[in-house]
Structure formats: C-alpha cells, structure tokens
C-alpha cells in the first residue's frame, strides 16, 4: 500500500512512510469494509463520516513537518486513524470529536494499538481544546469555509494548521497555513473532498 499509493505520489518523509506502514488501518474501519481497508479511498465509519484515504492522511502529516517534539490538535478525530498516525510523529496528540459513538470507538481502538500519547475528548472541535493550548500544529479532518477562530488562537506562533477549505458538497482545497508575526503564510496543496465541520449546535454531546 505505502509504496504504490503514497510514496510514488510524492510523499518522501521516511517517518511518515513508516507511520503509514505500521498503523493498522484495518482496525479503524468497520467489519463490512475490512476487505477494502488498505485501498486508497475514504471509507464510511458511520454517522455520515469517513476515514480518509491513506494518501491524503500521509500528505497532510508530511506537510506539517513534524519532528517529534510537537503538541498537535486534531479537530474531527473520528475513529482515531489520523490521531494514531500523528502519534508516531509528534510528542502529544489531542483529538476532539463531536459524535459520541465515534469518540468512544476511537478511545477503544487507540488503547488497543497502544497509542499512549493521544488524548481524546468528545465535544465541539470548532472550539479547539484551550486547556492544552498552545499547539504547534493543528489538523482539521473536516472541511470548513474558513479557519475556525478558536483553534487559530490556540496555535503557537510559527505553528501550522492544515485543513480542507471549501463548502460542503463542493470540491475543497487542502491548504497549509503557517502562523507568522505578520499574520499567516498560505500554501495551497491539492483538491480534496471531506465531510463538513459540524458544531455543537448541530449535535450536542
């Protein structure tokens, strides 16, 4: 999977490639999708959400340029797959998921695979996780029409936030934004399609 789907498409960071080899994606998908667990496509995980395709996960992780000393926040942690990948690349990972059932599933799976440096919360990811800020990097695993204000405030100076930018049911653009003393520096990466960011008014936890 890693060579054909990820490395040949330009992902070169050896730590990211090793993470994609070692994190068992099949444990994060439903039983009905086991046969496609290593296919390079998103798969439904219930509640209108998906586990992202491996190439996109790898590309997002590589773009953050993690060295192993960072504190990373994931907004929309879903079943926990991205958090598991990030856990091999960062010092500490924090994930916030709005849907209670997915949150509970992620807690179980991450415990099973031994991700001891991941902390998960059930709540509104659009509010970030202020108790653990500042973060060196933030991942939005859901599409937004702009950078959510609270996570941006919780991002350390020089930190990076990566997110799919665009409206639901439209092709979005994956962008990387670096926080600078003068504001921000944006890198546009590729077209993507993600489920939209949901807030607590859509589904209380």
Residue map of PLM features:
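Short, compositionally biased strand/turn segments
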Residues: 1-6, 42, 124-126, 131
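Class I S-adenosyl-L-methionine
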Residues: 184-205
């Amino acid at each position: 999977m890693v060579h054909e789907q990820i490395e040949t498409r330009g992902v070169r960071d050896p730590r990211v490639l090793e993470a994609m080899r070692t994190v068992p994606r099949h444990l994060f998908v439903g039983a009905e999708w086991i046969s496609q667990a290593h296919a390079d496509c998103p798969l439904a995980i219930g509640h209108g959400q998906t586990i992202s395709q491996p190439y996109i996960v790898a590309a997002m992780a590589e773009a953050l340029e993690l060295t192993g000393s960072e504190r990373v926040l994931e907004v929309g942690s879903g079943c926990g797959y991205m958090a598991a990948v990030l856990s091999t690349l960062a010092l500490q990972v924090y994930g916030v998921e709005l849907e209670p059932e997915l949150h509970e599933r992620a807690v179980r799976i991450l415990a099973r695979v031994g991700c001891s440096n991941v902390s998960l919360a059930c709540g509104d990811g659009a509010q970030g996780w202020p108790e653990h800020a500042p973060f060196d990097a933030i991942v939005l695993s859901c599409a937004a029409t702009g950078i959510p204000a609270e996570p941006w405030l919780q991002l350390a100076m020089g930190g990076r936030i990566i997110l799919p930018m665009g409206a639901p049911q439209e092709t979005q653009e994956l962008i990387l934004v670096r926080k600078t003393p003068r504001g921000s520096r944006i890198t546009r990466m590729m077209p993507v399609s993600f489920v939209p960011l949901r807030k607590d008014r859509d589904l209380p936890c």
